[in-house]
């Protein structure tokens, strides 16, 4: 049976200019998204506390869907089921969300919340289709010959998330969107550099195979028996260098964000860049060990994220990463006026009040990063099987 269009039934008071209260259904749906993330993706839940509510609420709906999509593909693989069928099921849920009809799935609350967010913020379907395309590449067991091939994958599974987060923050400029996608790709490359051994033991190889051959490593022979050596170290270093270059470019995009949004994005930027630094400190060996950023350093980085709200100098514009171009074009294009959309005002909260509010919870926010290190990807998001 068809349900009420969630885009109308879920007036998200955190993102609209009117003071219309949330409907009971909206309250229940958003509460379920937040609860799911708190249990299944505590790192995101904690980091999201550094974002203003106007971004945190819709971001929770988007991220809950992203995690559910990831879990659906992983669970299909673990259960011996067809991963491609899982991706097809996710596309059906997107069809429902973009048509304004919640999909009759086990996660109806997330579907309804997603439908409301994509309608209210006019998030192009191209972005979520690209995300699912990346999951489809994982389902194929695809490996990547060149850096450009790997960046195309990272653009789909992470650059898309950066673009959507930018839209939630009111960013529609090509430059701002390009930097948001850069951050997503950089974070994905950091994860890949950190998880080389863990991925290999699960039969996955993300390192560019051209780079491996240039280091005198046969990719498939190494994958059959992954070992750390000087060749692997050189490839990991090259990947970290690429990621670091992208992190440095992101500053131009952060400067375009509303003031209240900058601490959360800076936190992600600093913490993920530090993963690469920690890999380097450990001799670039991400085969026999998994780099973990010490808690004290996380606190220091978070403090920097809270303080560095204003750009220290004008960042030089950089060209859009070719792998991200289609995302930027899709997200920046609009055929009509978007002035009805609300975005967090950069002047809504004085910077000193933002710092005080964030600093009060900074140490608590760090704790989940430490406890969940290395465990988050294994924790499925629990969602009630029937809508509330």
Predicted regions, residues:
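Catalytic cores of Mg2+-dependent Asp-rich isoprenoid enzymes
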Residues: 2-186, 193, 198-388
């Amino acid at each position: 049976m068809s349900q009420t269009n969630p885009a109308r039934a879920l007036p998200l008071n955190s993102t609209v200019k009117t003071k219309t209260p949330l409907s009971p259904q909206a309250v229940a749906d958003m509460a379920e998204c937040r609860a799911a993330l708190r249990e299944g993706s505590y790192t995101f839940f904690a980091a999201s506390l550094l974002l203003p509510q106007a971004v945190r609420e819709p971001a929770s709906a988007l991220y809950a869907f992203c995690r559910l999509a990831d879990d659906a593909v992983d669970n299909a693989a673990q259960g011996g089921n067809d991963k491609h069928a899982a991706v097809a099921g996710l596309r059906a849920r997107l069809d429902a969300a973009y048509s304004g009809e919640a999909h009759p799935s086990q996660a109806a609350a997330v579907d309804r919340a997603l439908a409301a967010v994509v309608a209210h913020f006019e998030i192009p379907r191209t972005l979520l289709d690209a995300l699912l395309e990346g999951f489809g590449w994982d389902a194929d067991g695809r490996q990547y010959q060149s850096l450009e091939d790997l960046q195309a994958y990272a653009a789909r599974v992470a650059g898309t998330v950066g673009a959507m987060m930018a839209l939630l923050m009111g960013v529609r400029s090509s430059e701002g969107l390009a930097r948001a996608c850069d951050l997503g790709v950089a974070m994905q490359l950091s994860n890949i550099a950190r998880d080389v051994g863990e991925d290999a033991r699960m039969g996955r190889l993300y390192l560019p195979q051209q780079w491996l051959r240039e280091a005198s490593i046969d990719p498939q022979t190494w994958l059959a028996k992954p070992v750390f050596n000087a060749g692997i170290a050189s490839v990991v270093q090259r990947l970290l260098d690429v990621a670091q270059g992208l992190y440095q470019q992101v500053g131009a995009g952060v400067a375009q964000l509303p003031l209240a949004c900058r601490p959360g994005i800076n936190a992600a930027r600093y913490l993920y860049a530090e993963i690469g630094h920690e890999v380097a400190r450990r001799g670039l060996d991400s085969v026999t060990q998994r780099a973990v950023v010490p808690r004290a350093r996380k606190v220091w980085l978070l403090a920097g994220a809270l303080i560095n709200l204003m750009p220290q100098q004008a960042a030089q514009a950089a060209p859009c990463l070719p792998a991200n171009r289609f995302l930027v074009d899709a997200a920046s294009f609009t055929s009509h006026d978007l002035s009805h959309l609300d975005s967090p005002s950069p002047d809504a909260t004085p910077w000193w009040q933002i710092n005080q509010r964030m600093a009060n919870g900074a140490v608590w926010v760090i704790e989940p990063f430490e406890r969940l290190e290395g465990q988050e990807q294994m924790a499925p998001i629990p969602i009630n099987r029937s809508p509330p």
